[in-house]
C-alpha cells in the first residue's frame, strides 16, 4: 500500500458517537445506531471508512492471505487512532470452517500487528462456538450472534477487542459480553474500518 493509497483511505472525522464511533451531526453519548441497544463495550473506534478501497484491502488479507496488507492496515490504525488504555489486546475469533479454509484468522493477524505497534500483549481470550459468516448477512442475521462466543480463560482486566470491520456492532457486542462475563473490567473495540452512515 503506497503512501498515496493510505492517505486516500477515508478518515472518520468527528463529531462521533461517544459509544459506537459512528459519524454524527453533533456530539452525542449514544447515537440512533446504538441508543436503546445493549452494548457491552465501552467504546468502538475505527481508523477508516469502509469504502471500495478499504474493502479491497480487507478482502485481500482475509481471502487471499496477504499478510503484508494486515501489517499495513495495522500501521494505518496505529497512525490514526491513539493506543487504547488497556492491559491486553484480543481478537474476534474466526469460525473453524472459515479459519481452516483461509489458513489464518484475519482479525488475529491485525491484532498481533497492532500489539507490536502499541507494545501490548495479544492473547486469544475467545473461541467461536457457532456462526461466523457476516459478509452478505442481513441486519437481523448480523444481530443473531448472541451466544456465539466462549471465553477460553478469565479476563480480569481492561481489554481491547480487535476486528477487521465494524458493521452493526453485533459481533463486537456479543464478543464483549462474553469477555465481561469472564471478568474483563472493560472492553474497547478497535477495527481497521467501519461502515459509514452519518446518524
Where in this protein do the model-derived segments appear?
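Glycine-rich phosphate/pyrophosphate-handling loop used in enzymes and phosphotransfer proteins
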Residues: 1-199
